[in-house]
């Protein structure tokens, strides 16, 4: 795949290029590229107009992070998250229970979070922490869904223990072969508001 005359490959596998700037290339690693939990070093080749740059990159099993409302992966800001209990997605503030349009029943609120770095990861190894409350197991309502290259969503249910928590950091954790990978620390994480 080529963008603006630039190609990029990891271990001979073409990468999807999202943007190319003067000093930065945003790319999506090839799906199913293998890695040990401590990371695997692969050769990376970047070409532009006949010039070739060869170096190395370390690939880890997962590198989860949460998109902010501007759809960038950066510290702080508001999380890109919606109430997906009903067909029409709604934004924060969130409540812990929502009335379903079909059936008019009060149910646990289902939130959809926009993420990156979790492709090929099952819901069984994912947990989401809001403030001090951890959501995992049956609280994770879906496996990750690919929305765009490098962008996935995952749905989860808000537990009653989050009622009235207010503005809280949201952290994504993935455990691969006994090793834990977290999106960010609390002080740099994106946030959401729960009434």
Kindly give the residue locations of the regions a language model identified.
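A sequence-level detector for low-complexity, Ser/Thr- and acidic-rich stretches
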Residues: 1-195
């Amino acid at each position: 795949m080529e963008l603006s005359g630039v190609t990029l490959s990891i271990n001979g596998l073409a990468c999807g290029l999202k943007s190319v700037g003067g000093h930065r290339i945003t790319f999506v690693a090839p799906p199913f590229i293998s890695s040990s939990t401590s990371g695997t070093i692969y050769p990376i080749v970047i070409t532009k107009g006949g010039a070739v740059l060869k170096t190395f990159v370390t690939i880890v099993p997962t590198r989860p992070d949460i998109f902010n409302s501007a759809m960038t992966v950066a510290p702080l800001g508001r999380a890109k998250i919606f109430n997906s209990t009903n067909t029409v997605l709604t934004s924060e503030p969130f409540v812990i229970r929502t009335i379903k349009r079909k059936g008019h029943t009060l149910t646990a609120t289902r939130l959809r979070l926009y993420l990156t770095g979790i492709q090929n990861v099952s819901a069984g190894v994912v947990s989401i922490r809001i403030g001090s409350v951890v959501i995992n197991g049956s609280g994770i309502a879906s496996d990750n869904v690919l929305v765009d290259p490098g962008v996935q969503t995952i749905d989860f249910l808000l537990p009653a223990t989050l009622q009235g928590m207010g503005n809280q950091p949201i952290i994504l954790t993935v455990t691969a072969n006994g090793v834990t990978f977290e999106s960010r620390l609390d002080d740099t994480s994106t946030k959401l508001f729960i009434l």
